Amino acid sequence: AYHFPPVRVSSGIQRTLKFCTYLREYGWDPLVLTISPKAYEVTSPDQLNEIPEDVIVERAFGLDTSRHLSVAGKYFHRMAQPDRWVSWWPGGIWTGMKMIKKYQPAAIFSTSPILTAHLIGQSLQKRTGLPWIADMRDSITEPGYPRDPLTWKIHRKIEQQIVHRCTKAVFT
């Protein structure tokens, strides 16, 4: 999950935090794989205390292309496909595989927006064979969104891969 404390920009944080809290009531022990706080533009420690104490949180390396790989505030937008946090993908796979070996979860759950989270979930599923649940909070593609035709094609292809390859998809 990209949207996880200490990021301070999205209501998606609450969704992931509540999953961590309430899934335990149904016999699940959530593990959270998220990105390094360095990737977040705005952080706040305010919600860190809402993470249940017994929930394991691992943070993988990742950068925000627009901030960390730009020159004079400009960056090559094609480097940021499918999103600005694509550099999280390799670190997410590495950290996720270590977590899977150590904790042996029953399933993989990824949530978007931030398509890279689903790419990580898909990659982990392919390597482990674990069931993968893809939580699609917002539309990935719609007519005219994203505006850039190449980005639309890339997002559309990823969207189709997610729905085709995941074990279950959740749409809200």
Give the ranges of each region predicted by the language model:
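N-terminal subdomain of nucleotide-sugar transferases
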Residues: 1-61
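Nucleotide-sugar donor phosphate/pyrophosphate-binding loop at the beta->alpha transition
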Residues: 38, 128-133, 141-161
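A short, charged, and often flexible helix/loop element on the N-terminal side
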Residues: 56-91
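An aromatic- and histidine-rich active-site surface loop
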Residues: 82-94, 105-128, 134-136
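Glycine-rich phosphate-binding loop signature in dinucleotide/nucleotide-binding domains
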Residues: 99-105
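A short beta-strand/loop micro-motif in the catalytic core of glycosyltransferases
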Residues: 164-172
